[in-house]
Structure formats: C-alpha cells, structure tokens
Amino acid sequence: MMCEVMPTISEAEGPPGGGGGHGSGSPSQPDADSHFEQLMVSMLEERDRLLDTLRETQETLALTQGKLHEVGHERDSLQRQLNTALPQEFAALTKELNVCREQLLEREEEIAELKAERNNTRLLLEHLECLVSRHERSLRMTVVKRQAQSPAGVSSEVEVLKALKSLFEHHKALDEKVRERLRVALERCSLLEEELGATHKELMILKEQNNQKKTLTDGVLDINHEQENTPSTSGKRSSDGSLSHEEDLAKVIELQEIISKQSREQSQMKERLASLSSHVTELEEDLDTARKDLIKSEEMNTKLQRDVREAMAQKEDMEERITTLEKRYLAAQREATSVHDLNDKLENEIANKDSMHRQTEDKNRQLQERLELAEQKLQQTLRKAETLPEVEAELAQRVAALSKAEERHGNIEERLRQMEAQLEEKNQELQRARQREKMNEEHNKRLSDTVDKLLSESNERLQLHLKERMAALEDKNSLLREVESAKKQLEETQHDKDQLVLNIEALRAELDHMRLRGASLHHGRPHLGSVPDFRFPMADGHTDSYSTSAVLRRPQKGRLAALRDEPSKVQTLNEQDWERAQQASVLANVAQAFESDADVSDGEDDRDTLLSSVDLLSPSGQADAHTLAMMLQEQLDAINKEIRLIQEEKENTEQRAEEIESRVGSGSLDNLGRFRSMSSIPPYPASSLASSSPPGSGRSTPRRIPHSPAREVDRLGVMTLLPPSREEVRDDKTTIKCETSPPSSPRALRLDRLHKGALHTVSHEDIRDIRNSTGSQDGPVSNPSSSNSSQDSLHKAPKKKGIKSSIGRLFGKKEKGRPGQTGKEALGQAGVSETDNSSQDALGLSKLGGQAEKNRKLQKKHELLEEARRQGLPFAQWDGPTVVVWLELWVGMPAWYVAACRANVKSGAIMSALSDTEIQREIGISNPLHRLKLRLAIQEIMSLTSPSAPPTSRTTLAYGDMNHEWIGNEWLPSLGLPQYRSYFMECLVDARMLDHLTKKDLRGQLKMVDSFHRNSFQCGIMCLRRLNYDRKELERKREESQSEIKDVLVWSNDRVIRWILSIGLKEYANNLIESGVHGALLALDETFDFSALALLLQIPTQNTQARAVLEREFNNLLVMGTDRRFDEDDDKSFRRAPSWRKKFRPKDIRGLAAGSAETLPANFRVTSSMSSPSMQPKKMQMDGNVSGTQRLDSATVRTYSC
C-alpha cells in the first residue's frame, strides 16, 4: 500500500546529471516537479478510490439494513396472520368437534328410529282407515239389526278392536318422550279396553239369550194361531196359555230394556271413539312437528358437517402456511444472522479504513511539509550548486539518505500495523481471560457453598461422635467410681488377709495330697514326671481327685519342693504376690471342678477318656473334692474382690514395664516376658497375663480406652469377634459377644463347641508353647494367670466362653516359631491398660489423652512393620500381629476382616498358603472382589519382601496410598463417576485391583452397565498406568494444570467442566456432571471427538454457533494439551504421536520411594530418613483422607457386611 502511495525517487535522475559537467541545474528541477506532481496525483487517486469504496460500502450497508427492516416487517405481519388464523384453544376445538361428531351419530340413530316409527304408524293408520270404511255400515246398523245380525258383524268388530288395540300399544312404545302428557290418556284407553271386553262378553251372552227368546216367541205365535183356529178348546187351556204369554211378554220387555241400555253404552263408546280419533289426530300433528324438527336437525347436521370440513381444510391450509412460515422464518433468521455478521465485518472494515485514511492524510501532510522543506533546501542547494559543485555531491548523498529513510519509514509503518493487529488480539484474549475469571469466581462461590454445606454436615457428624465420646467418658467415670469403692473394700479386706493366707496354705497342702493320690491311681500315662499335658490354662481344674478328666498333673516338684526345702530361693518375688498366685491356682482348680460336670458330654473321644478315668478314681476322692468345694465356697467372694484389686496395686510396676517395653521394642519382648517371670518385677495374676488364658468372663481381661477402633466397631455392631491380641472390653460386666455378627466361619463354631469338652486332647508342643507364652518356668504352680481367669465365672457366667478364645487357641497349634509372643502381647496390653488409667487420672479424662493413646498405638503398629522391613524378613516369616497390622494399615481391610484374620491367621506363611476356598471358608470372605483384593495384596507383599524377586516400580500400591477410600472418595469423582462410589466402597476396590477387574465384575459386582462409563473407567486406569500408579505425581500434574491448558491426560471431571465454562458454554457445562468425561478420555480415546462431547453436553443441533465454538476449542485443546494430532488428509481424524513415553519414563524404586516418602510410614521406605514419633499421626492422617467429609464418610462405609 505504501509503495503505491509513496513511490521511491530514483537516484539516476538526480544531481549526477548536473555533475556531468553541464553546469546548469535547470533540467533537474522540472524532473523533481514532475515526480512530485505524479506523487500527488497518485495520492489523490488513492483517496478518491477509498472514498468510492466507502460510499459503496455505505450504500450496501443501507440496502442490507432496508432489507433487514423489510424482513422484520414481513416476519411481524406473518406472525400476526398466524396468531389471527390459528384458534387460541386448539385442543378445546378438537374436543368440541369430537362431541359434535358423537351428537351427530346419536341424532342419526334417532332419525332412523323416527323414520321406522313413522312408517309403522302410517301403515297402521291406513289399515285402520280401511277397516273403518269397510265396516262403517255394519257398525251403524248393529243396534237396529241386532236380532238378525250375522256372525260376520262380530268378526268386523273384533278386527276393529284388535286394530285399535295394536295402535294404542304402538303409541305406548312410540311416545317415550311425551309419556308424561299421554299417561292419563293411556290409562283411560286401558279402562275402555277393559269395558269393551266386558261389553263384548255381555253382548255374546245377550245374543244367546236373544236367540232363546226368538225360539220362545215363535212358539208363542204358533200357539196363538192354533188357539185362533181351534176356539172350541176348553177355558182351562186358554187360561194357561194366557199366563205363559204374559210371562214371555215380561221377559221381552226386560230384554228390550237391556238392549236400550246397551245401545246407550254403545253410543257412549262411539263418543269415546271420537275422542280417541281426535287424540290420534293430535298425535299425528305431534309427529309432523317431530318430522319438521328432524328435518331441521338433518339440515343443521349437514351444515355442521360442511363447517367441519371447511374447518379441517382451513386447518390443513393453516398448517401448511405455518410450516412455510416457519421455514421462511428460519431462513430469515439465518439471513439476519448472516447480515448481522456482514454488517459487523463491514463496520470493522469501515473503521479500519477510516483510521487508515486519517493516517494517510497525516502522512500526506507530513510528506508535504517535508517536501516543502526539501524544495527550500533544494533551491538553496541549487543556488549554491552553481558555484559549489561539492555541495551537489553532498546533496546527492542527502537525497539517497532521504530515500533510505523513507524506505525505513515504510517498514516501520508496516511493523506498526502488525503491532496494532497483535494489540487487538491481546485485547480479545484479555476479554476472554476476564470472562474466565468471572466464571472461576462463580465456580468458587459454588464450591464455597458446597464446602459450607459439607462443613455443616461434618459438624453434625462430629457432634454425634462427641455425644458418643461423652457417653464413653461417663462410662469411664462410673468405672473410676467403682474402682474407688473397690479400694475401700481393699482396706476392709486387708484385715482378713492373714487368716486367708493360713487357710490357703492348708488347702494347698490338701490339694497336693489329692494330686499325688490321683497320680498314683492313673495307669495309662507313663510319663508322670514329664511336662504336663494341657492346652488351655483353664483345664488345670480337671486334675484334682474329683475331676472326670484323663489329664493328670505331675507331682509339683518345682515350686513346692523349693518352698519346703529352701524358701529363700523361691521367695525372690514379693511374698504377698506369691501367695496371691497360689490362691489363684487353687481357686482355678475348684472352679474347674464345678464346671467339669457340664463339660463331660461334648465329644465322643473325650467321653471315652472321661469314662475310663472315672473307673480309676475312688469314691473317697469324690467326697473329698465335694467337701473341699463346700469349704471354699464361702470364701470366694472376698478372694475375688481382693484379686480384682491386685490390678490397681500393680500400676507403678506396670508403668515401669511399659517404659522398658517401649525402649527395648518389639524385638526383645520375648526376653522381657521371661524377665518378668524370673526377676524382681512381680507377675500379673489378674490383668497382665489374662489374655493368654481363655477368659470365663470379662473380669480377667485388661481394660482399654473406649476410643479404640475395635471399640467403635463393637459399638456399630459390625464385628465383635476380637482375638486376644486386640481385646478391648470395657468393664468386668462386659463379656465377649457375637450377637450382632455371624461367626467368622463354620469352623469357628465347631471349635467353639469343642472348646467345652475337648480341652484335654492336646500335645506336648502346645504345653511348651503355653509355657513360653506365659513366661513360666516350673509348670502350673508358677502360672498364676491361668487360675485367675475363672474365679468370677463361678458367680457370674460359669458356662460362657468367647468364640475368640476357642478359635485363637486351637489355631495356635500352627504357631511354632514364636515363643513368648502371647506373653509379649499380654504385657503390652497390660501396659496400655494401666497407662490409660494413669493418663485419665492425670488429664481428667480429656480428649487429648485419648488422642495421644491412639497415636501411640498407631506408632506401635508402624514400628512392627518397620521392624519386619528393617530385618528384611520375607512375608512367610512375619508373625501374626505384623500380618494383622499389615492388613489393617497397608491393605486397608475393614475391621471385621482384620478381626477374623487375627483369630485365624498366626503367621505370614499361613496367610500366603491360603487358597481362595480357604479364604472363603476360614476367614469368612464371601465377596469375590474382597478375596481378589486379599490375594493381590498377598502376592504383592510377597514379591516386595522376597529377596529373590526382581524390584518392582509400583511400591506405592503396597503401602496403602491408593486404598479403597482414595478410589471411592477421590479417584471416581475425578473421573466423573461418583454414582458408583458406594459399590466400589462396598467391594473395597483399591488401585492394585484396577488392572484385574473384568467386564463381568464391572457389570455384576460394581453395577457399571453403561458401556461409555466402562470405557471412561478404562481410560482412567490407563492414565494411572502411565503415571506408574504414583499418587503424588498425579496430584502434582493436576495442580500444575489447574490454570493452564496442558497435561490434559490428568484432568479431572471438574477441570473439564471449568474448561467448558472458560470457552463460553456455561449453560451446558453442568450436563457433564456424573457423565464420565475426564482428561484421560479426551487424550486417549481416538473415537471421542467434539460431536460426542456436544452430545454429552446436550447442545442442540440447531445451535451451530455453540457447536462451532466447541469444535474450534476442542481441536485447540487436543493440539495444545494432548498427543492427538490432525492428519494432513483429514482434519477430523487424529493420530497419536509417539512422544508419551519420553514424558513418562519409568522411574527407579529409589527415586519413587523418595518422592512419595510423605505417604509411607516413617523409617520404612527410605532407610536413610527417620521421622519422629510426633510426626507420624499427621502423616497417617494425610494418607487416609484428604478432606473432612471424606474422613467422615469412611467411617460409615466400613459397616458393610460380607
């Protein structure tokens, strides 16, 4: 453009001609003038051309505006015509039309009936007229010629009466509508018919009498003739004849009177017949009026039909016109939109041209000014050039510099135009950014509202939890009050202790004597001096002389002999504690003696041994046992109270033991158990070792804090089957129940039944295991906790045994590589119990102490896993508590499965050897996905801990980072599939299970029947697989891509909705909620294009503008944020660029573990870094959940039953 406006001045036509030696400047000045004139002419022509184009564009704009105005007028007129032509109530008109059709049909039926009745009446009337005309004379002459009437006259009267009767009956049926007016006439007609019938009968009778009288009169006349002809007859005969004749005359006169009466009645009948004929005429008149009405109704019917046809034709015409008008309206709309677009474009072009025109005018002015200056300078230089040729050379240089400057000026102007265009683009982008900011603010407002709602809900739930905790605190307060009362009773029982010690020593001597007698009577056991054969410590009571069991104790050599020979060696423990231990053993024997009667009947094998032992025992031994039980019965209450209070006396020693245990760690707990049984630390007859014996009631079990997870599970009624290593029973009134949950397996029920009667058929390995676990040296005398567990059961519940005790001990046969483990768990529990009591007293039952206790327990669990990891033990060598902690923390199994596994699985070898059917039968896991979860977790931890297995890169799955709570609460909502959360949480689906879910599992167990949702789910799994199941990497990438378009692969459903809002499709954005649309679907599914997205957004096909915007922005999104690209041939199909693996290269285990160290337990994944115990609860809180609502939801989801 600038080249046309400002042509460059050629250098060949300048002053070099003057430098050729001619010496005159006159030829160069006209050339410069001509160039300037050409420049001005070209500028003027350009201006004229621009003005012409401006005028043309203005004219076209005016024309288009006029057309648009006309189109608007035409549209308004058509709309008005449409409104006037179409009825307002079309549905009402159709209903009325249907009603009119029904009425017309009814009228046609009535018309047909009236026509038929009219024909019938016409025929009947014609027949009546014929009869009347035929029999008129006979009716008139009936009375006159009654005597000589022939039988034909009767038939004519009968026919007339029949015709009238049929006529009246027909009119009865005809006149239904005028029945009220004709009711009186019909009644009268019926009366007349009856009278007519009666008269007809009387006439018949009179005819017969008349015939008889005729015969009599004929005979009388004959007699008169004879009398006249024979007058010489006697006077007697004449007198007789005269008498009979008088009688006949009287009869004739009577008959004449009767005939006169009948004639009068006949005249009355004629009058009535005349009235009936008048009535018939009236009916005919009514029939004529009905015919006229019928004709009118037919005419109206035809008119209505004609109107209906016209209305239907008008309706069809109007529909056709409406369709044409709609088409024209749509075309006009399209034309109007196109005209608006063209108008906007033309206005923009006009504004640009105006600005360009102003710029050119300014440039022209500047050029003119420069030109004038140049002319002045040129004149001066020409004047000087006449005398100074050097000045001409300088002028030539200046002219060349001026031309270069003009060229540079043209380049600068072009650059200015480019900068202006870029500025306009930036302004548009700024407007879009402001719109996005507004949308983001609206979205933030919605999010704040939802967060407020969630916070209110969480506040309500926390209030409920607070109420429950306050109730638990009240229970603790009541327990403390009971403890204070027990202390008072302890002071009272201190006085009686000396007498009780003396009595117990005497009873012990008698018991030793009875045991020696029982051993001498037994012949089936060859090893009397060897280790006693027992499995459960409660079975000690079966070895006295009254017992029916075949298990007999050896003579008590260890402690008793040492006590008699050298008391100083054995009395290293506290004298009082030792005496209490002896009391406990004696009382356990007596309690078992009382329980043996009920326990005899369980099991056939046990019954054989019991019967054989009865034959060996003497009746005197039974009597001695009975007397011994009667003697001790009175003292059991006081001894029971004293032993319960011994727990409180041991608080200080147990606190010291807990401190030692926490310093030494879990690796040296076995030695600590032995140290406690041999050193100066006294044993724990009631609380510390109670969990290693089967408790008869809850009195012997240590109390735990009520904030523990198993206690919450017990309160929810999910599973109260808690094994001894994790007993959390509140008070001595609480027993271990299974009312609210089924047993863990059928095998557990069978073992519970065997526990009552088959306590004696165990092996020497079990005896060694129990001795090691309780930390004893010399046998049953030194095991005080085994006797204490059944004391209170004599009064409270002598026959009640927990399912957990039977399962835990009979499964304990498999636990051979763990001596002292039960003692370790018991000591740990005792320490926890007493520490809990002391902390409650110090802090006043505050929540801080409960939280610290909970954190300490969690830290101890993590220390177990850290110890196993530090030692490098394979999973098969893990012990029972470590396996249970692994299930609870890393696998994320619910509390009821953890409890069942704690009761049934005692080592990692047992857990790894379980098959699918054994998992279902032994642990009670019936859900196939639950079994899949457990099997995959076992395979993963075995490969992770096996020294021969290759290192895996997916270590994050093994440590519970992406458990089922993360899947249900975070991952599924990020995919836009939160509607399946409850099914996934119920099936405990975690990240390691995602690659193993089949279509059958998705459709059946997880209820994901929509194929599009399954495709979206698979794309989400592919995204996790590409990120190597690294949760931290996923969260980091999502955080980075929150405000800019990149890494669409990791976009969540919310991020896609925000992108939809940012491109200006706000009204359709909410349609993507719960639709399954997320970034991985956009980036990985080749078949998912903008049309599928528009279908999910529910954008109508008529809205071409929104669809065009979506197509443009969708393509830009794929280009900028994904690896999908347009092919050169077809813009609609995409291809995948092979650069994804470069972005996500596989990381080594060390780097991955170091990057995800925050989600792992401390001192486990990375051995070089250690975290303090105080930081551990925070890390676990970060692992478990992200928000307060998710933390609250997890507690409710765990109550599913399998």
Curated annotation (Swiss-Prot):
Q: Where does this one sit in the cell? A: Cytoplasm, Cell cortex; Cytoplasm
Q: Which residue stretches does the UniProt record annotate as biased composition, category Polar residues?
A: 832-841, 1184-1202
Keyword Chloroplast listed? The answer is no
**Which portions of the chain have biased composition (kind: Gly residues)?**
15-24
Annotated SAM domain residues: 878-944, 963-1027, 1051-1120
| Positions carrying Phosphoserine | S150, S239, S242, S244, S448, S666, S668, S693, S763, S1133
Region spans: Disordered: 1-33, 224-245, 426-446, 651-855, 1163-1202
Designated name of the protein: Liprin-alpha-1
- Species for this entry: Homo sapiens (Human)
* Organism classification: Eukaryota, Metazoa, Chordata, Craniata, Vertebrata
